[in-house]
């Protein structure tokens, strides 16, 4: 539904040049729109409280999140709820509830077999509401396990709107359609239409925010065809997620199934890989149906495992990787009019090239990412605050950023 408006580009360049003569030389935010990067609460304040709970989202907002992220799956009675996966045997206390013991089964999702598990589509919303959410990552607080319910999308939206009024700042939501190909099969098996999952999301968001690209909402997915479909149904901002299996010693990305390509591509025996999506040609393709990309962070900053113990702790691990700088993906994405929101930053894991989580985030912010997903909202907020920004210059440029943002339109499919 959107495509670039090229007439604005000369205007923006001329205005920027004029401003540069009026303001002392300085660096503003190197983001697509010139505004400060977003801090996106990955699954809520999941570093502190059980993920995808209203309490976790509220905590993230209290810590300063700009957006909260509900991953979405669907119940047996067609309600969209927030869970990271359709699999709920480990993220809830369902295994301890005898009345649901007969729901344990084995299913395959995106080529991966889940044995002796419980699946959200086998429960009604009323049944899910009797479960309690649990912490899913080892080493994190567990004292709240079982205390918080699984929220619906409607409840997440209501929370964001209420907190926006309470705090006086706009709190957005960043829903992800989880495993769309799988959920389309679920929809059909339950008697709903093939695109019910996507259509239900769109109708819910339009009712809450309207059909506009300025809504405080992003819709994200690792698949392609569902985003292309959504591009024909909504003006709400769309984000193509980009995955990989691992990062190699030389800094390249390992592409091993099922993390080598979007699953809707895989089921058609297509050749398009995730790495292809962040090539120059791939980014041009993504710009025809989406507004931004959400790549795993090693796609953006090259780090190399060269065997040097840089932290001096006697163990050579990911934190010791040599940082070689930008891969160029951010710059190329911006050149294609795409913003870049990267993931996932954690205080307790997954640091590459840094032994301080805030410093790692700062490195990506300085490269120009437009947003960061983190389990620890407070660290993300501190990282944004720590990156210098001349206020006067930034405010002037933010006005130009709005012009550029409004001028960009996705191609109509």
Regions found by a protein language model. Name each.
Residues 1-27, 400-402:
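Gram-negative bacterial Sec-dependent N-terminal signal peptides
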Residues 410-413:
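Short, charged juxtamembrane terminal tails flanking transmembrane helices
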Residues 388-408:
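A short, hydrophobic C-terminal helix/tail in secreted or cell-surface proteins
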Residues 6, 39-40, 405-407:
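Short alpha-helical segments used as structural interaction elements across diverse proteins
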Residues 15, 26-386:
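Phosphate-group recognition and catalysis centered on beta-loop-alpha active-site segments
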């Amino acid at each position: 539904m959107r495509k670039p408006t090229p007439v604005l580009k000369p205007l923006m360049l001329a205005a920027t040049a004029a401003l540069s003569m009026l303001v002392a030389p300085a660096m503003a935010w190197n983001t697509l729109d010139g505004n400060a990067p977003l801090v996106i609460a990955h699954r809520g304040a999941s570093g502190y409280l059980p993920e995808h709970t209203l309490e976790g989202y509220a905590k993230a907002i209290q810590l300063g999140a700009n957006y909260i992220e509900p991953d979405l799956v669907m119940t047996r009675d067609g309600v969209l709820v927030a869970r990271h996966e359709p699999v709920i045997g480990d993220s809830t206390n369902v295994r301890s509830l005898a009345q649901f013991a007969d729901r344990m089964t084995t299913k395959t999702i995106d080529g991966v077999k889940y044995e002796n598990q419980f699946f959200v589509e086998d429960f009604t919303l009323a049944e899910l509401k009797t479960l309690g959410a649990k912490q899913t990552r080892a080493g994190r607080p567990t004292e709240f396990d079982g205390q918080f319910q699984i929220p619906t999308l409607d409840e997440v939206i209501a929370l964001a709107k209420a907190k926006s009024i309470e705090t006086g700042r706009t709190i957005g939501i960043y829903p992800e359609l989880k495993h769309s190909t799988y959920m389309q099969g679920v929809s059909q098996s339950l008697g709903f239409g093939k695109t019910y999952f996507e259509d239900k999301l769109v109708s819910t968001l339009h009712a809450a925010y309207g059909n506009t690209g300025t809504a405080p909402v992003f819709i994200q997915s690792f698949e392609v065809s569902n985003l292309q479909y959504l591009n024909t149904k909504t003006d709400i901002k769309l984000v193509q997620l980009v995955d990989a299996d691992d990062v190699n010693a030389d800094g390249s990305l390992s592409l091993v199934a099922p993390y080598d390509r979007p699953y809707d591509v895989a089921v058609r025996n297509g050749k398009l890989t995730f790495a292809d999506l962040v090539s120059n040609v791939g980014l041009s393709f993504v710009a025809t149906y989406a507004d931004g990309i959400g790549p795993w962070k090693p796609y953006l900053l090259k780090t190399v495992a060269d065997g040097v113990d840089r932290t001096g702790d006697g163990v050579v691990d990911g934190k010791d990787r040599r940082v070689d700088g930008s891969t160029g993906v951010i710059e190329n994405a911006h050149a294609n009019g795409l913003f870049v929101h990267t993931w996932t930053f954690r205080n307790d894991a997954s640091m590459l090239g840094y032994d301080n989580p805030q410093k790692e985030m700062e490195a990506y912010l300085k490269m120009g990412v437009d947003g960061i997903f983190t389990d620890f909202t407070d660290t993300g907020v501190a990282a944004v605050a720590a990156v210098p920004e001349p206020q006067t210059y930034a405010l002037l440029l933010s006005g130009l950023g709005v012009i550029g943002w409004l001028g960009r339109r996705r191609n109509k499919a």
